[in-house]
Amino acid sequence: MESDNLQDPQEETLTCSICQSIFMNPVYLRCGHKFCEACLLLSQEDIKFPAYCPMCMQPFNQEYINDISLKKQVSIVRKKRLMKYLNSKEHKCVTHKAKKMIFCDKSKILLCHLCSDSQEHSGHTHCSIDVAVQEKMEELLKHMDSLWRRLKIQQNYVEIERRTTLWWLSVKLREEVIKRVYGKQCPPLCEERDQHIECLRHQSNTTLEELRKSEATIVHERNQLIEVYRELMTMSQRPYQELLVQDLDDLFRRSKLAAKLDMPQGMIPRLHAHSIPGLTARLNSFRVKISFKHSIMFGYTSVRPFDIRLLHESTSLDSAETHRVSWGKKSFSRGKYYWEVDLKDHEQWTVGVRKDPWLRGRSYAATPTDLFLLECLRKEDHYILITRIGGEHYIEKPVGQVGVFLDCEGGYVSFVDVAKSSLILSYSPGTFHCAVRPFFSAVYT
């Protein structure tokens, strides 16, 4: 490795502490430690949040800064080492005692100007060492960039690697909620409850097996990319004089094949919305008419600074979208209430309740602990349902009306797919003990 040749103490600062070689695309963290960008990200094998600095273990949440100045220093030092090597006595042509400043691409060797004119090499392609180094590095970096972009894209799917656990927890939570809902039905529907739970468990086990297969495919694909990328990176860090004489055709061939592999997307698990007999009929006994105040705002941050999306950073929102926010004219602190919100014309929306008062002076600011909402957001080519508890909920997106059931005494709110008379999800009893106000927000594109 090129780091083995470091002698100048100043040049020791150009060595990555992870790969123990000269920096490639150096970055630095807030704690001050510097690494190759690839070394830093690939060292986080579990892709945990927050991620930690490999040196001091301070969290950095995948936030780092490209060190342009250090990158320039690295380039200068590498060229300096090459010239030192070319000017050394050991490097001179044995036959002509001249410097070897010409590269023969056919033979992959360095030549002096007299050897390059010889009959042996007369039909070969020659160029100066500077040009050869530049072309070789450009080709290496081109392959590295192609694989790195694929690895970065795969980071959008890192949650898939832990989705099996999230799925299992989501199903267990849903099972408890379903039991609680059936327990409130009158008369108790024990047989229907057991059938519902059995169906849920069967779907859960089937999906879990598919998730594991999907996970294995993604991990295998990622490991293939990482293996080839590490080979390219190791080669790019070698001294220029060694890099030139290497035959990289096989490595470049494998790099192209790896870059063309189908990108596994991972499956998107969803639980079917099973009907609960008598659910909507029971909730309609608490039906109230909710009057809303309306406000139209432009831009996401001005509407929802509490940002539920913190649970899912990869969710994309268009800055040109318009968010219409509505909140109930009346707050509730006692009793049970049920209302429905028509969402058939909205693809992205938020429904639920939030702590009263809604307005704090003239500010719309709220903290996540003030909010008891169900939010539907677009994520790439599909939609997800999330709450501030439990993150993503793997339930089919409701089409049409969503029912909201508020139990002030119980301190929770539930959401219902009206068309299917099925439970979407429910907050746990005792989640809040305060007056709350109905809330609704929709996105207009």
Curated annotation (Swiss-Prot):
GO MF annotations in UniProt: zinc ion binding
Keyword DNA-binding: no
Keywords: Metal-binding, Zinc, Zinc-finger
Zinc finger (RING-type): 16-57
Name assigned to this protein: Tripartite motif-containing protein 43A
PROSITE patterns in alphabetical order: B302_SPRY, ZF_BBOX, ZF_RING_1, ZF_RING_2
UniProt binding sites for Zn(2+): 93, 96, 115, 121
Family affiliation: Belongs to the TRIM/RBCC family.
Pfam families tied to this protein: SPRY (PF00622), zf-C3HC4 (PF00097)
Zinc finger (B box-type): 88-129
Species whose genome carries this gene: Mus musculus (Mouse)
Matches recorded under SUPFAM superfamilies: B-box zinc-binding domain (SSF57845), Concanavalin A-like lectins/glucanases (SSF49899), RING/U-box (SSF57850)
Domain B30.2/SPRY: 270-445
InterPro entries on file: B30.2/SPRY, B30.2/SPRY_sf, Butyrophylin_SPRY, ConA-like_dom_sf, SPRY_dom, TRIM/RBCC, Znf_B-box, Znf_C3HC4_RING-type
DNA-binding recorded as keyword: no
Coiled-coil segments on the chain, per record: none
Family annotation (Gene3D superfamilies): 2.60.120.920, Classic Zinc Finger, Zinc/RING finger domain, C3HC4 (zinc finger)
